[in-house]
Amino acid sequence: MTDKLIIFDTTLRDGEQSPGASMTKEEKIRIAKNLERMKVDVIEAGFAASSNGDFDAIHTIAGLVKDSTICSLARANDKDIQRAADALKPANSFRIHTFIATSPLHMEKKLRMTPDQVFEQARLAVRFARKFTDNVEFSPEDGSRSDMDFLCRVLEAVIAEGATTINIADTVGYGVPELYGNLVKTLRERIPNSDKAIFSVHCHNDLGMAVANSLAGVKIGGARQVECTINGLGERAGNTSLEEIVMAVKTRKDYFGLDVGIDTSQIVPTSKLVSQITGFVVQPNKAVVGANAFAHASGIHQDGVLKARDTYEIMRAEDVGWTANKIVLGKLSGRNAFKQRLQELGVSLDSEAELNAAFMRFKDLADRKAEIFDEDIIAIVSEESALAQEQEHFKFVSLSQRSETGEQPQAKVVFAVEGKEVTGEARGNGPVDATFNAIEGEVGSGSELLLYSVNAITTGTQAQGEVTVRLSKSGRIVNGVGTDPDIVAASAKAYISALNKLHSKDDKVNPQRS
């Protein structure tokens, strides 16, 4: 009988800790729904004690997602654990994930606690969490740099208190595959009650080995849960990539001998959604989800693939959700045809109002752009869904601009502030700079522009531009995304989207730095 590997996604918690990747509640909900559609086993929806916003997001997701276990992180104290339990109350199935650092460096320098104090706090935290659920996970933070004897002592105690998952964290990406795999193996062999818990791996990519370490923890160590994120999103160099773990285990089932319950056809759509929301573009040569992942430039490779796909392809692009980017609709296409194509693409909208708004956007685009591709439709729906859920303190209305050779461009932007239209006019070093100056002249946000990037959604000069804007103010970093065939209009939409998030986003506590 084949074992099952549990996929624990922490995009909404650890992934969001990547600078600039912060998400609104509405964005977290959209990603959580996609993760559920993908059949992810456990979704770590956030860190309930970090902010009221995170608590609310976890609470809402817990009520909406029915087929995945919802999890909240909590430090090893009663206050955090109580907050997590309260946030998770609406869930069909939930888990409390509590942690404390166990390495000598962290205990001395960060916690300023003795090993005995850490031992006792870990034990009591799990005992308290068990009052709310029998599904409790414990992580020894910086486990890969912890003393083996002490680690065994702590883990034996928390399992005795009722921890059902033990997660070995390679917090700073220090591990290498053979050593990390043997660490998990040794723990399972030395801890007398290790059979009472599932062992899990959580690796960071600082040395580029997060996926390799995780797979070693599974193959060598016998771990049966992998903690990972979509696109490998995460602090510093990122986390273990969900798509790489899943496809490695599925493609090399002959070696790993494990099943995963993931619907792999949802991998690419979810990857694109996370990229669009966070503004973190997926590198073209990224395994599984990169644009070049299934591209063959070499003539020899192309010839081989045409004769027999398995000569150079070990996976099928369609199995992970890649679809041919074909022309599907035009300006004469009706609402039913639009709705049917959305269903074929696996795209869903929450209401008829959102569908109607997206269809109107499609008709407007079809009048301006001769050829409408699947990617155009996905971009329209994604932005419309975001707009429907975004708290629109500011709303883009229109844009006009004037530019002559030898003179600074001038932009005129009309937008609404709490329903009241205002007009900003300004010059700048280029049309985008002038547009941003016009908006800032009326808003006066005092924010700093950290990132401006443009991505063509399809090919050709009529392609829609997808613009990402990243703003920072008082330590908060937010992203805004806008799409339009007019790059400057897309830029204005993205800037206003970022301002809306800056206006509504609350501060959060980073669990590793508090």
UniProtKB/Swiss-Prot annotation:
PROSITE patterns: AIPM_HOMOCIT_SYNTH_1, AIPM_HOMOCIT_SYNTH_2, PYR_CT
GO cellular component terms, A-Z: cytosol
Residue ranges of the region described as Regulatory domain: 395-514
Residue ranges of every copy of the Pyruvate carboxyltransferase domain listed in the record: 5-268
Main location per the UniProt record: cytoplasm
Protein's UniProt name: 2-isopropylmalate synthase
Pathway: Amino-acid biosynthesis; L-leucine biosynthesis; L-leucine from 3-methyl-2-oxobutanoate: step 1/4
Subunit structure: Homodimer.
Subcellular location: Cytoplasm
Catalytic reaction(s) noted: 3-methyl-2-oxobutanoate + acetyl-CoA + H2O = (2S)-2-isopropylmalate + CoA + H(+)
Binding site for Mn(2+): 14, 202, 204, 239
Gene transcribed to yield this protein: leuA
Biological process annotations from GO: L-leucine biosynthetic process
One Pfam family matching this protein: LeuA_dimer
Enzyme class, UniProt record, top EC level: transferase
Gene3D superfamilies, per the entry: 1.10.238.260, 3.30.160.270, Aldolase class I
Organism: Burkholderia cenocepacia (strain ATCC BAA-245 / DSM 16553 / LMG 16656 / NCTC 13227 / J2315 / CF5610) (Burkholderia cepacia (strain J2315))
Family recorded in the similarity comment: Belongs to the alpha-IPM synthase/homocitrate synthase family. LeuA type 1 subfamily.
Obligatory cofactor(s): Mn(2+)
Entry function: Catalyzes the condensation of the acetyl group of acetyl-CoA with 3-methyl-2-oxobutanoate (2-ketoisovalerate) to form 3-carboxy-3-hydroxy-4-methylpentanoate (2-isopropylmalate).
Key words of the record: Amino-acid biosynthesis, Branched-chain amino acid biosynthesis, Cytoplasm, Leucine biosynthesis, Manganese, Metal-binding, Transferase
Molecular function, one GO term: manganese ion binding
Enzyme Commission number(s) from the entry: 2.3.3.13
